């Protein structure tokens, strides 16, 4: 982490110690922009001509936002969001929950575009992805397969994105919300879905949820396995 970023986070902590708000935007910055032609070329180079219909160039941003850590205390997490290059339409949100990562530096907020963020944003959706607590900018312990902090990192990022677009009238959101995750991200997706449906039903309306290949009952499965003859 750079000295400047450490200093910025320290100042932020001091000035907001008594004004914490889940989903508050701390900072945003552009990581990179790719034109429609660049996105099409990069997708073809990586996947071949698989029929992905790109319609827009896109810009991907790094975002810092307020959320809760594994102990229920306030903290700052990082993530990304990518915006289609158009001010004429209202776009839905696609929230991607990534699989298991073991290094903070491998977080998407340190990498910018990948094939999924290119495909989603160039097709006319707002792509968002949390690094999770303990990855990316966060120095906290990563709460691996813990329901509440996993859900909070996703829900508060979506809140932060909505807050950001509320202040930027050039970008409009529609009501569509897609949750997609694989491996650890499958678990995180289901945790976020459960919290949205049970605790925040007036705030979120999920269009479709795709939790894939997640360890949904890790403790229960391991207990049965360990007690086998």
What annotation goes with each model-predicted range?
Residues 83-90, 160-180, 200-204:
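Gly/Ser-rich "nucleophile elbow"/oxyanion-hole loop immediately N-terminal to the catalytic nucleophile
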Residues 144-167:
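Alpha/beta-hydrolase active-site loop
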Residues 20-89:
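Catalytic-loop region of hydrolases
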Residues 70-78, 82-119, 137:
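Short, surface-exposed "cap/lid" segments of acyl-processing enzymes
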Residues 197-229:
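Alpha/beta-hydrolase-fold enzymes
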Residues 181-185, 189:
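Gly/Ala-rich beta-loop-alpha elbow adjacent to hydrolase catalytic centers
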Residues 134-143, 165:
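Glycine-rich "HGGG/HGxG" loop immediately N-terminal to the catalytic nucleophile
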Residues 93, 121-131:
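A fold-wide structural signal in alpha/beta-hydrolase
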């Amino acid at each position: 982490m750079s000295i400047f970023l450490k200093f910025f986070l320290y100042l932020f902590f001091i000035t907001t110690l008594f004004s914490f708000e889940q989903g508050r935007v701390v900072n945003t910055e552009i990581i990179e922009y790719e034109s429609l032609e660049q996105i099409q070329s990069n997708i073809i180079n990586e996947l071949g001509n698989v029929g992905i219909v790109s319609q827009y160039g896109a810009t991907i941003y790094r975002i810092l936002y307020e959320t809760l850590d594994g102990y229920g205390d306030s903290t700052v997490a990082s993530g990304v969001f990518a915006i289609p290059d158009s001010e004429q339409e209202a776009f839905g949100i696609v929230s991607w929950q990534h699989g298991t990562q073991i290094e903070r530096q491998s977080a998407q907020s340190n990498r910018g575009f990948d094939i999924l963020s290119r495909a989603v944003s160039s097709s006319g959706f707002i792509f968002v992805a949390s690094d999770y607590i303990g990855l990316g900018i966060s120095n906290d312990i990563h709460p691996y397969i813990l329901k509440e902090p996993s859900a909070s990192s996703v829900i508060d990022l979506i809140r932060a994105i909505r807050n950001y677009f509320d202040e930027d009238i050039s970008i409009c959101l529609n009501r569509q919300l897609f949750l997609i995750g694989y491996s650890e991200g499958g678990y995180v997706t289901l945790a976020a879905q459960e919290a949205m449906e049970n605790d925040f039903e007036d705030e979120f309306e999920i269009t479709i949820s795709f939790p894939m290949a997640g360890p949904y009952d890790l403790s229960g499965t391991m207990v049965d396995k360990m007690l086998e003859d």
